[in-house]
């Protein structure tokens, strides 16, 4: 069997992030992710998001512009939903319940009219890293790639951003996201925690005012606040 290696030049991620995460791409766990991915593709298993969107969160959010990290768990597993951005769905796709609650909170917090589109690309382009902890999923099988090793990669991203950047905002929604708090230096960054926006979660997300709190912090550290409208 041909040995699988990592050709960093072929990873579909922008050069700024490629250099920032170069060491991670060369680690054994990332090679294991690639093996699992290729095995699934060779078995004609459908994986979401499409290959060109797996690193979309990074490709839309320039490293030098990063201001906020919103951590999700894993991609949507139904057709035409996953686009490589946590909580986001493409234009003209029905808005999922969690994202509906996010839009409700935006209205409560900043009086922003709920959007008709669930595409959060505009946030990403302003410096919001919409990062899922797990970056791929098998069609119609939630959390099916949770054993692949993606968490090690996303944990490394969070930890490296915490160490090498300053004045970031980390939004941690739900117990899973809150467990990542240990990766973040709270003397350099603002950590905002709340319940998950899912309607199935206990109350605690609506009313958190994370969006206004994030912008107040960004202004305090001399950064341009985020325009949270969806365009």
From Swiss-Prot:
Enumerate the subcellular locations listed in this protein's record, separating them with semicolons: Cytoplasm
Please give the biological process terms from Gene Ontology that the record holds: base-excision repair, AP site formation via deaminated base removal
Recorded catalytic reaction(s): these are: Hydrolyzes single-stranded DNA or mismatched double-stranded DNA and polynucleotides, releasing free uracil
Kindly report, in one word, the top-level EC class recorded for this enzyme.
Answer: hydrolase
Q: Which residues cross the membrane?
A: none
Task: Write out the catalytic residues in the record.
Answer: 74 (proton acceptor)
Q: Pfam families, from UniProt? A: UDG
Keyword DNA repair appears in the UniProt entry: yes
Write down the EC number: 3.2.2.27
* NCBIfam families, per database record: PRK05254.1-1, PRK05254.1-2, PRK05254.1-4, PRK05254.1-5, ung
Q: Which family does it belong to?
A: Belongs to the uracil-DNA glycosylase (UDG) superfamily. UNG family.
Purpose: Excises uracil residues from the DNA which can arise as a result of misincorporation of dUMP residues by DNA polymerase or due to deamination of cytosine.
Put simply, this protein is called Uracil-DNA glycosylase
User: Organism, per UniProt?
Assistant: Campylobacter jejuni subsp. doylei (strain ATCC BAA-1458 / RM4099 / 269.97)
> What would be the name of the gene that encodes this protein?
ung
């Amino acid at each position: 069997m041909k040995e699988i290696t990592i050709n960093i030049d072929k990873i579909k991620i922008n050069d700024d992030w490629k250099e920032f995460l170069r060491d991670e791409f060369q680690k054994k766990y990332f090679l294991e992710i690639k093996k699992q991915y290729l095995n699934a593709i060779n078995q004609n298993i459908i994986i979401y998001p499409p290959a060109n969107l797996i690193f979309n969160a990074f490709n839309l959010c320039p490293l030098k512009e990063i201001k906020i990290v919103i951590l999700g768990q894993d991609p949507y597993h139904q057709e035409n939903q996953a686009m490589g951005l946590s909580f986001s769905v493409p234009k003209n796709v029905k808005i999922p319940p969690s994202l509906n609650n996010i839009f409700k909170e935006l209205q409560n917090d900043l009086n922003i009219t709920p959007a008709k589109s669930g595409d959060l690309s505009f946030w990403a382009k302003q410096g919001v890293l919409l990062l899922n902890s797990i970056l791929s999923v098998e069609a119609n099988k939630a959390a099916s790639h949770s054993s692949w090793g993606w968490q090690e990669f996303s944990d490394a991203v969070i930890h490296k951003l915490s160490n090498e950047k300053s004045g970031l905002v980390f939004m941690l929604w739900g117990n899973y996201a809150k467990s990542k708090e240990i990766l973040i230096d709270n003397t350099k960054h603002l950590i905002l925690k709340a319940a998950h926006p899912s309607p199935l979660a206990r109350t605690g997300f609506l009313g958190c005012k994370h969006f206004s709190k994030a912008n107040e912090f960004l202004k305090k550290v001399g950064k341009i606040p985020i325009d949270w409208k969806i365009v």
